Swiss-Prot record:
Protein name: Cytochrome b
Subunit structure as annotated in this protein's UniProt entry: The cytochrome bc1 complex contains 11 subunits: 3 respiratory subunits (MT-CYB, CYC1 and UQCRFS1), 2 core proteins (UQCRC1 and UQCRC2) and 6 low-molecular weight proteins (UQCRH/QCR6, UQCRB/QCR7, UQCRQ/QCR8, UQCR10/QCR9, UQCR11/QCR10 and a cleavage product of UQCRFS1). This cytochrome bc1 complex then forms a dimer.
Pfam family, one: Cytochrom_B_C
Subcellular location: Mitochondrion inner membrane
Protein's gene: MT-CYB
Length: 267
């Protein structure tokens, strides 16, 4: 229950490693992006495994972060204001990273997801439309959008790593929380071998279901629509995000007014 911080660290390391390997074979161009992902899966040694681990690793990242936040809420970790606030920034940065990453394969749901979510900024009075066109780099989601999304997806994980160090620095100021909410000083034990072995056990227990998912049901959490290359002329019957954003999308769609939905989501 107290392990999810270390699991998030290993998730981040795994995602950066698999992501760098994928970036080596990816082409950030609307005409080539979809083909380059297919090429990675078909022709690159273990490319299919790297892609499956990266896609499902994102799901595990969100499972761990939601449990980590849930535990923090239950045990009052929000009282450590600096640690909590850096954690909130980390969550938002992670969501931004996952969103721009989902656009990169340039499948149908990638394209339409990018169109729908970036369009939300147009709900801002006066400057909204200008912001959207500035983000797109034109009058629709196109090549400039994909290029800048790839840049952001490459950059943001390193920003997350930096924020994680700040998060841990603030945590070390107060010491770790515990179920009783009292000082942990009297319970301090050597990091090695106790915590190191505990973390290795946690990593093993997380990698087992991740590998099972990546090897036996790699597309279980994905959208079949994304196996179709992006087509700006055909809207998918249901535009929906990955499971880890469904709560946000539900808030957004629960109010029948664009600005109202955006405000509810922001709140």
């Amino acid at each position: 229950w107290w392990n999810f911080g270390s699991l998030l660290g290993i998730c981040l390391m795994t995602q950066i490693l698999t992501g760098l390997l994928l970036a080596a074979h990816y082409t950030a161009d609307t005409t080539l992006a979809f083909s380059s992902v297919a090429h990675t899966c078909r022709d690159v040694q273990y490319g299919w495994l790297i892609r499956n681990l990266h896609a499902n690793g994102a799901s595990f990242f969100f499972i761990c972060i939601y449990l980590h936040i849930g535990r923090g809420l239950y045990y009052g970790s929000y009282l450590y204001k600096e640690t909590w606030n850096t954690g909130v920034i980390l969550l938002l940065t992670l969501m931004a990273t996952a969103f721009v990453g989902y656009v990169l394969p340039w499948g149908q749901m990638s394209f339409w997801g990018a169109t729908v979510i970036t369009n939300l900024f147009s709900a801002i009075p006066y400057i909204g439309q200008t912001i959207v066109e500035w983000a797109w780099g034109g009058f629709s989601v196109d090549n400039p959008t994909l290029t800048r999304f790839f840049t952001l997806h490459f950059l943001l994980p390193f920003m997350i790593a930096g924020l994680t160090i700040i998060h841990l620095t603030f945590l070390h100021e107060s010491g770790s929380n515990n179920p009783l909410g009292i000082s942990s000083n009297c319970d301090k034990i050597p990091f090695h071998p106790y915590f190191s072995l505990k973390d290795i056990l946690g990593f093993t227990l997380m990698f087992l279901p991740l590998m099972t998912l990546a090897l036996f049901a790699p597309n279980l959490l994905g959208d079949p629509e994304n196996f179709t290359p992006a087509n700006p002329l055909v809207t998918p019957p249901h535009i929906k995000p990955e499971w880890y954003f469904l709560f946000a999308y539900a808030i957004l769609r629960s109010i029948p007014n664009k600005l109202g939905g955006v405000l509810a989501l922001a709140a």
